[in-house]
Amino acid sequence: MSEIKVGENETLESALRRFKKKCARAGVLSEVRKREHYEKPSVKKKKKSEAARKRKFK
């Protein structure tokens, strides 16, 4: 889990902004979305191969 230390003269808005940025860099939200529903291994493999195909033809 991402943690930040709030400075003495730091506003809540700026601390929240730093926290959100740190979470985004750590990939927390994307991980939550990915794990929201169970995905069968065959579906994972299919998505992975489709993504590779898209990257190849770009």
Curated annotation (Swiss-Prot):
One of its GO terms (biological process) is translation. Keywords: Ribonucleoprotein, Ribosomal protein. InterPro entries: Ribosomal_bS21 (IPR001911), Ribosomal_bS21_CS (IPR018278), Ribosomal_bS21_sf (IPR038380). GO terms for cellular component: ribonucleoprotein complex; ribosome. One of its GO terms (molecular function) is structural constituent of ribosome. Residues 35-58 are annotated as: Disordered. Residues 43-58 have a biased composition (Basic residues). Disulfide bonds: none annotated. It comes from the Bacteria. Belongs to the bacterial ribosomal protein bS21 family. This is Small ribosomal subunit protein bS21. It comes from Clostridium botulinum (strain Eklund 17B / Type B). The gene is rpsU.
